[in-house]
């Protein structure tokens, strides 16, 4: 454990950030799984609805630095292509 006051504060802040980021990461993964489940079921309408809900979440995570912007773009591109292939 840190002895210096500023180091203690940094430890508390980083733990708070870690928990917050874990929550956001979990939320993002859940939304991606919902889209993939809808694609797997073959229901294009529900897949599009889930994708529409997941897209702003993915973008927000990229903006906040939780995931890289290229990773966000890759996720959206691949999911979109899979939904298009359902037709």
From Swiss-Prot:
Residues 1-31 are annotated as: Disordered. It comes from Pseudoalteromonas atlantica (strain T6c / ATCC BAA-1087). This is Small ribosomal subunit protein bS20. It holds the Pfam family Ribosomal_S20p. InterPro entries: Ribosomal_bS20 (IPR002583), Ribosomal_bS20_sf (IPR036510). Gene3D superfamilies: Ribosomal protein S20. GO terms for biological process: translation. GO terms for cellular component: cytosol; small ribosomal subunit. GO terms for molecular function: small ribosomal subunit rRNA binding; structural constituent of ribosome. HAMAP family: Ribosomal_bS20. Residues 1-27 have a biased composition (Basic residues). Keywords: Ribonucleoprotein, Ribosomal protein, RNA-binding, rRNA-binding. Binds directly to 16S ribosomal RNA. Belongs to the bacterial ribosomal protein bS20 family.
């Amino acid at each position: 454990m840190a002895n210096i006051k500023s180091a203690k504060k940094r430890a508390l802040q980083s733990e708070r950030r870690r928990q917050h980021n874990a929550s956001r990461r979990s939320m993002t993964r859940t939304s991606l799984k919902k889209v993939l489940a809808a694609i797997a079921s073959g229901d294009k309408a529900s897949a599009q609805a889930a994708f529409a809900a997941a897209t702003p979440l993915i973008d927000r995570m990229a903006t906040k630095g939780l995931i890289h912007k290229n990773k966000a773009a890759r996720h959206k591109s691949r999911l979109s292509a899979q939904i298009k292939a359902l037709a």
